[in-house]
């Protein structure tokens, strides 16, 4: 009987595929797997109800709707995100570290900034520098109040901006920033020598400006943009009624944020469909994984619609790479403490959102953990995981950079992760749940890449 059922399903699948081939509209190809899934009974109704109740208790619901962004503003933001004109030596764009083909990260443990060569995992150092922290994905981040892994760009509960620019980010600028902290975030990488501004070279007027004169750097970038007729037209369309002479780099940054907030907003994962009432959206293993996630300590930090509390935690990740110039070695990274000055924030970093997380490897504030499964396993007896960290998983050039600061990390690591033990079966279930957080539309973002940009400079593309 079982063999006959399989042949019946094969026949159904082949018939569906043939019908699709003859149809006027393309149809997703039928497979034995999809036929079996269609015949599969839904998971246990009691478990379905329980998981939905647990999710509601932790504020885990649908993502907030994407903000309204005018088409001219989104087009301007797209052009700016992919245009190398924002970098000092015109050799990299925002997208060089936030590549659509790598889930809007770059596929590297640690990025290579200005004056590097190429993009993605094969990017070479050239005359550039290794950036101390992993390039965070920008998928579904518009609702977060803290940007960057240390939260140095923040909008507080009263709507006030707190950034490294201090008073240089003027009230007139902040009034332009429509999309919260996300609107301010793109203002800062172009001011960093290591990230985008680069070192002095012919044609790099940005590098000659003092490091702390952010307002002068922003003005110089706008001078570049306003020298390009197409950008002048695009800014006029995006900000009708604003004279070109009153535009600041806040207008450019806000446009990039508007593009990110709409183009990289994904709310149709199996998990979203489950929350919306589709009892068949999750497989039994994914449902079991969701229940596990919601009943063990994961949910204490990964909660809310983005599955991030938007707060800061020390989860005992090994320190690799050049670091932020902290500690006796100058290769340490004190995390949130670098922003607040509070010793309680030592080695704390922002909780990463988990939507589409399987697309954004590597993981950890410094990309020290290469695979998603390994990152889940890291939370099982995390103290031992740190002490037994295996650098062979890293690219060869980073394997010798693991810092011997494990005792200091463990002295301040969050107690919430103490005592967590995950069996291989539990890891399998959690992994299945993580995959249920992926919107199929996020798997191929090639259409986000423009064919050309107004500067005429090359565009990073696969």
Task: Please report, for each region that a protein language model flagged, where it lies by residue.
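Positively charged n-region of N-terminal signal peptides that target proteins for export
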Residues: 1-4
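Periplasmic c-type cytochrome electron-transfer domains
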Residues: 6, 21-462
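Bacterial N-terminal signal peptides
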Residues: 8-17
């Amino acid at each position: 009987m079982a063999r006959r059922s399989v042949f019946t399903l094969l026949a159904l699948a082949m018939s569906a595929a043939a019908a699709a081939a003859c149809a006027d509209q393309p149809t997703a190809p039928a497979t034995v797997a999809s036929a079996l899934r269609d015949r599969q009974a839904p998971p246990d109704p009691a478990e379905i109800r329980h998981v939905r109740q647990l999710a509601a208790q932790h504020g885990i619901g649908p993502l907030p709707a994407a903000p309204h962004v005018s088409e001219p503003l989104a087009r301007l933001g797209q052009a700016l995100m992919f245009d190398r004109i924002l970098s000092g030596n015109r050799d990299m764009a925002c997208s060089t570290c936030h590549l659509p083909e790598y889930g809007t990260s770059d596929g590297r443990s640690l990025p290579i900034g200005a004056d590097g060569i190429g993009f993605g995992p094969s990017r070479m150092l050239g005359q550039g520098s290794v950036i101390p922290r992993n390039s965070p994905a920008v998928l579904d981040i518009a609702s977060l109040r803290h940007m960057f892994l240390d939260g140095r760009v923040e909008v507080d509960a009263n709507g006030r901006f707190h950034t490294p620019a201090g008073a240089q980010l003027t009230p007139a600028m902040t009034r332009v920033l429509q999309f919260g902290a996300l609107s301010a975030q793109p203002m800062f990488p172009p001011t960093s020598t290591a990230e985008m501004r680069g070192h002095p070279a012919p044609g790099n007027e940005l590098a000659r400006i003092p490091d702390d004169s952010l307002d002068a750097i922003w003005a110089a970038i706008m001078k570049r943009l306003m020298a390009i007729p197409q950008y002048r037209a695009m800014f006029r369309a995006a900000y009708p009624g604003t004279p070109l002479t009153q535009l600041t780099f806040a207008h450019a940054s806000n446009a990039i944020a508007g593009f990110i907030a709409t183009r990289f907003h994904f709310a149709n994962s199996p998990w979203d469909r489950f929350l919306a009432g589709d009892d068949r959206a999750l497989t039994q293993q994914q449902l079991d994984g969701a229940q596990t996630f919601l009943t063990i300590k994961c949910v204490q930090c990964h909660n809310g619609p983005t599955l991030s509390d938007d707060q800061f935690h020390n989860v005992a990740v090994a320190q690799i790479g050049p670091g932020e110039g902290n500690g006796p070695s100058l290769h340490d990274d004190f995390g949130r403490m670098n922003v607040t000055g509070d010793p309680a924030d030592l080695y704390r970093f922002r909780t990463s959102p988990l939507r589409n997380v399987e697309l954004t490897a590597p993981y950890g504030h410094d990309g020290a953990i290469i695979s998603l499964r390994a990152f889940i396993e890291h939370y099982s007896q995390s103290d031992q995981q740190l002490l037994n960290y295996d650098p062979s998983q890293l690219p060869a050039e980073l394997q010798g950079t693991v810092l011997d600061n494990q005792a200091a990390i463990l002295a301040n690591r969050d107690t919430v992760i103490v005592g967590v033990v995950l069996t291989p079966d539990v890891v399998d279930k959690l992994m299945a749940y993580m995959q249920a957080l992926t919107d199929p539309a996020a798997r191929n973002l090639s259409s986000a890449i423009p064919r050309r940009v107004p500067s005429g400079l090359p565009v990073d593309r696969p």
